[in-house]
From Swiss-Prot:
Residues 47-332 form the Protein kinase domain. Tetramer of two alpha and two beta chains. It comes from the Eukaryota. The active site is at 164 (proton acceptor). Keywords: ATP-binding, Kinase, Nucleotide-binding, Serine/threonine-protein kinase, Transferase. Belongs to the protein kinase superfamily. CMGC Ser/Thr protein kinase family. CK2 subfamily. One of its GO terms (cellular component) is protein kinase CK2 complex. Its EC number is 2.7.11.1. This is Casein kinase II subunit alpha. Casein kinases are operationally defined by their preferential utilization of acidic proteins such as caseins as substrates. The alpha chain contains the catalytic site. GO terms for biological process: asexual reproduction; DNA damage response; DNA repair; regulation of cell cycle. GO terms for molecular function: ATP binding; identical protein binding; protein kinase activity; protein serine kinase activity; protein serine/threonine kinase activity. Pfam families: Pkinase.
Amino acid sequence: MNHSSKKNKNRILRNKARIYCDVNLHKPKEYWNYEALNVKWETQDDYEIIRKIGRGKYSEVFEGANIKNNEKCVIKVLKPVKKKKIKREIKILQNLCGGPNIITLYDVVRDPQSKTPSLIFEYINNTDFKHLSPTLTDFDVRYYIRELLHALDFCHSNGIMHRDVKPSNVMIDHQKRKLYLIDWGLAEFYHPNQDYNVRVASRPYKGPELLVDMEDYDYSLDMWSLGCMFAGMLFQKDPFFHGHDNIDQLVKIVKILGTEEFYAYLDKYGIVVDHTILSIIGKHPKKPWSRFITKENQHLAVPEAIDFLEKLLRYDPAERLTTREAMEHPYFKPLSH
């Protein structure tokens, strides 16, 4: 893959966000310069671990409690990673604190001996998405997707890309009809002329730009991931694009969206993809979305849902709906504002 990266340095056209492009230009440097963050570590003695509730590549997650007031919390114990990455996550959580549907960071603590850092978050009475999704009504899907858009619009408007949107990073308290976007460990500040690491997001939710080494991606990466998640909900098939490796992931996408628009996207930006990969991809017509509609999902896969999906799952990042445009889509009309 590196071979194509070098070639892609001299591309004919660079990509730029269509919305919120210069947000960080108008913010003070300390807003986005997370490496300069001086973390004020608190003592972890105020918190106790109750039970393990999850684990990721970079952390282990526990249900915990604040001993002082007996309030439940979530304790995210970070595995050894670069200091820079921890600072980035903390800075982003601080910047977004209080935003709509954004998980609240209560505290940052570390073990005085081992120096292992932990992040303390509000507790959410979460229903596992895999179990919840099949039970959701048409109205529920519209409602929760719009709630997720509120969180994404807030983070994008604050100059931040999440870069790991997927069902397991969306917590839903269905009783309270509250949604939270969690796990900001891969989130990053958007600067229009910066190149970014393409090794982000989980494979089924990776945008085509990541799979072809397009390093000048932007917020619209999150809109692709949202589209994948939405497709999974609509057609009750999650993950919707299920590749076994990154090349196979691209093949899965191309077999549905077709090769014609894929090559048009590569040509527009002058993206070079390895010949061996192109030969694996081959040539495929675009599949109509109606192919995926069944008796079981037709109550969800209504025409305006398909129209909305189609406007998210575009190869070209510049063609995808922005968060603002997405919220204006007729699909959300039935929700009272």
